[in-house]
Regions:
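C-terminal active-site subregion of NodB/CE4 polysaccharide deacetylases
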Residues: 1-65, 71-72, 188-189, 199-202, ...
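Metal-dependent polysaccharide deacetylase catalytic core of the NodB/CE4 family, i.e.
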Residues: 20-23, 59-62, 82-242, 269-275
Length: 296
């Protein structure tokens, strides 16, 4: 009860608006999360960014964003937004929409296989991962994708996958992406917005200037061609400080009106191309949701 009272007191004193970030979450949990934040008002991402740009108040306003374009997540939660008249932004990584699984999905597949089949990690000829615990292995793989380039990431992950499971057989159970026809149909509604999450979902800090430009420009063009609407926001893959560098922020400023991270915080005196978001997950109770928002 005391924590609840403190949370409510802090929430009432907060001045800046905020951007929520979701990944894979059930529609029931998503709806409960948003309703727990009312009467604060969900508004379009573009609008909250514009208010922030002009120095206008964003108090008691927030924007809803979903990363990665997982089909079930997008379709089911879009229905929730439609029912409640909530504006929502979906960040799409283009290669995933075109059929290529995301690196973190491969790691989760490795983790699942390890937990189901092995008491310890099976023998590997990779000297970097000999005599390593399963927990440590998964932590190291996640650490790697936050800072490494696409070729290294895929090389390592495919190496492990081939050793411990039949990838061609099991990948059918991996999360499917939304398809372009579905993107086009949803985009017809004014409540929806599809924005860029790059091409390959690779940390931009691991890329050359040419690669960063390609990720940003090509993804922007692909979505605009599909929806016929302007793509004005970029979401940095992984979103952590170590996954973003000064060069990527500078390049984003040339092609977009804003760019978002997964660094927790509210919209205060933030760089428009390094905007914080508040991440919410399936396991978060509504009390924790309000606490996260209160302390951000």
């Amino acid at each position: 009860k005391l924590i609840f009272q403190i949370t409510e007191k802090v929430l009432n004193k907060q001045s800046g608006g905020y951007i929520l970030s979701f990944h894979e979450v059930s529609p029931e949990v998503f709806e409960s999360h948003i309703k727990s934040l009312l009467p604060s008002k969900p508004i379009p991402l573009e609008e909250i960014v514009q208010r922030h740009r002009l120095g206008k108040s964003t108090k008691e306003c927030f924007a809803i964003t979903f990363d990665d374009g997982v089909r079930n997540t997008v379709l089911k939660n879009w229905e929730v937004c439609l029912k409640n008249n909530w504006p929502v932004t979906f960040y799409l990584p283009i290669n995933y929409i075109n059929g290529e699984n995301l690196p973190y999905q491969k790691i989760l597949l490795i983790e699942k296989s390890l937990n189901e089949k092995f008491d310890s990690f099976p023998q590997t000829d990779d000297k970097n991962f000999k005599n390593i615990s399963k927990k440590k292995l998964i932590a190291e793989l996640f650490k790697m994708i936050y800072v490494s380039n696409k070729s290294k990431v895929n090389s390592y992950l495919d190496h492990f996958i081939k050793q411990i499971l039949d990838y061609d057989k099991i990948k059918q159970s991996m999360p499917k992406a939304i398809n372009w026809n579905e993107v086009r149909e949803i985009s017809k509604n004014y409540l929806s917005s599809f924005q860029s999450h790059g091409l390959s979902h690779t940390a931009v800090s691991a890329m050359s200037e040419k690669e960063i430009k390609s990720e940003m420009v090509e993804s922007k063009n692909a979505i605009e061609e599909c929806t016929g609407k302007k793509v004005n926001s970029f979401c940095y893959p992984y979103g952590a400080a170590r996954s973003i560098n000064k060069l990527s922020v500078e390049i984003a400023s040339k092609y977009f009106d804003s760019a978002t991270t997964l660094i927790r915080g509210r919209l205060k005196k933030n760089n428009l191309y390094y905007l914080p978001r508040i991440d919410l997950y399936e396991e978060n109770e509504t009390s924790l949701v309000r606490l996260k928002v209160a302390i951000s």
